[in-house]
Amino acid sequence: MDPAEAVLQEKALKFMCSMPRSLWLGCSSLADSMPSLRCLYNPGTGALTAFQNSSEREDCNNGEPPRKIIPEKNSLRQTYNSCARLCLNQETVCLASTAMKTENCVAKTKLANGTSSMIVPKQRKLSASYEKEKELCVKYFEQWSESDQVEFVEHLISQMCHYQHGHINSYLKPMLQRDFITALPARGLDHIAENILSYLDAKSLCAAELVCKEWYRVTSDGMLWKKLIERMVRTDSLWRGLAERRGWGQYLFKNKPPDGNAPPNSFYRALYPKIIQDIETIESNWRCGRHSLQRIHCRSETSKGVYCLQYDDQKIVSGLRDNTIKIWDKNTLECKRILTGHTGSVLCLQYDERVIITGSSDSTVRVWDVNTGEMLNTLIHHCEAVLHLRFNNGMMVTCSKDRSIAVWDMASPTDITLRRVLVGHRAAVNVVDFDDKYIVSASGDRTIKVWNTSTCEFVRTLNGHKRGIACLQYRDRLVVSGSSDNTIRLWDIECGACLRVLEGHEELVRCIRFDNKRIVSGAYDGKIKVWDLVAALDPRAPAGTLCLRTLVEHSGRVFRLQFDEFQIVSSSHDDTILIWDFLNDPAAQAEPPRSPSRTYTYISR
């Protein structure tokens, strides 16, 4: 660097150091804007390209001896004005020239056409009075008001070149930054620092720990890894299920005990990548078809076949062809209770924390106490087999082989009244589903009909299947249906458009369920297929990539299935119930543990 520029730069920095912090921001913003107003440094020539329409400049001192800055006897403002004039008026003396004499300020090189010029860095002689004048200038500077100081420094910066602006800007930037995470605990505000960091995701939290010892202490004392895991468990069913199945949920959502006998932050930090590894393993198992399998043999004495089922973590409730409802312990796979009363096959069922409601080929709907197995109510309305039913929030919808749909009001298990009968299908209504907005029904007449839930008025018909429709699920705007034309169709319920046709089953698609990630279907060909729902909703995805895996274990028609993030539970004409576990794959457990490949990038869908 040119010696003269070095001296000027040093002087400017010392002025900055003498300024109060409240002035730095204004000076930094000015320095940021100056490159577009002043000149650019040309590294190829070592020269400064001026953007000013200036003629050949004269020596700043005009050959005169350096002038001394003498304190005014008037007000501080007069002192400021006097010094500013000395520093900024080329006709008197600039601050740089009084501090550092120059012999040649500008050397101008004319080009052939004489229209442009290059300014060569100034060559200066150091003044013997530099230190004295600098101290005097700083003394005046300290006496001025903040607004006068800012104005003076702005004028000073405006006289500098592009390189000096950049250097001053880089000098000021660290001064304008504050480590608030370190500063807050010093003022007794640890909880605020912890709360700020608690919004970080895992990757950012890991990086925050490495900033410094104080950040690591805040992260550790605030138990931020524990809070991150708790946040994921509250908002994501996959994490919630893992907490229950792996047992680490017992360490969450508890205040630190008085004796301090609780897992440290390091326990939760080490737990997080293990959870991510479990999630990756589950996803990989779904895609590759790796699973452990448990089989329940229903051992029906007369007619064999399990037509319907529903499960939770403790039990499986199944409806059988032999007219019974059997309740199984999900852990021991033993039959805990058998409910009898129907005189025909149990074709459909649903239960909640209070009741089990079943529909049968005997044309009745029966209500049972889920805890005692006592029959509480019998509804007689349909004149043929009740093929499907759904209930929720005090409302039940049933459908029948008699081509009708019945809408019921449920005040209590013993007080269920018929509200409305919906007609319009020209064949047996095989399946219904509903939410607060729509009732959706599918029939052997090849159509799906949509009805208004509140008014029970008809809304629209979805056409597309070439044969009767056997199964359906509806959620949000999406309807997924399976048909005896061996296809699965995805529909937008609002506009009635068919979004995708899935082909792959060889016989009637008898049952279908979907969640946010995948569709699982079962068919009369004895196969269960897993489909990528996200890809299926993308019109650019090739049809051949949509089926992730085909599972073949049943020896008869697949009648019903249900699934969650960890498992599929299915029933079949072969009189068995199969539990397909994608979390606890024996082959994967035999392998040595591996590091998760996306330890801090899990995204919930």
From Swiss-Prot:
Gene3D superfamilies: 1.20.1280.50, 6.10.250.1840, YVTN repeat-like/Quinoprotein amine dehydrogenase (2.130.10.10). The keyword Cell membrane does not apply. Residues 128-177 are annotated as: Homodimerization domain D. CDD domains: F-box_FBXW1A, WD40. It comes from the Eukaryota. Keywords: Biological rhythms, Cytoplasm, Host-virus interaction, Ligase, Nucleus, Repeat, Ubl conjugation, Ubl conjugation pathway, WD repeat, Wnt signaling pathway. Ubiquitinated. Deubiquitinated by OTUD5, promoting its stability. SUPFAM superfamilies: F-box domain, WD40 repeat-like. GO terms for cellular component: cytoplasm; cytosol; nucleoplasm; SCF ubiquitin ligase complex. WD repeats lie at residues 301-338, 341-378, 381-418, 424-461, 464-503, 505-541, 553-590. Homodimer. Self-associates. Component of the SCF(BTRC) complex formed of CUL1, SKP1, RBX1 and a BTRC dimer. Direct interaction with SKP1 occurs via the F-box domain. Interacts with phosphorylated ubiquitination substrates SMAD3 and SMAD4. Interacts with phosphorylated ubiquitination substrates CTNNB1, NFKBIA, NFKBIB, NFKBIE, NFKB1/nuclear factor NF-kappa-B p105 subunit, ATF4, CDC25A, DLG1, FBXO5 and SNAI1; the interaction requires the phosphorylation of the 2 serine residues in the substrate destruction motif D-S-G-X(2,3,4)-S. Binds UBQLN1. Interacts with CDC34 and UBE2R2. (Microbial infection) Interacts with vaccinia virus A49; this interaction inhibits NF-kappa-B activation. This is F-box/WD repeat-containing protein 1A. It comes from Homo sapiens (Human). The lineage of its organism: Eukaryota, Metazoa, Chordata, Craniata, Vertebrata. The gene is BTRC.
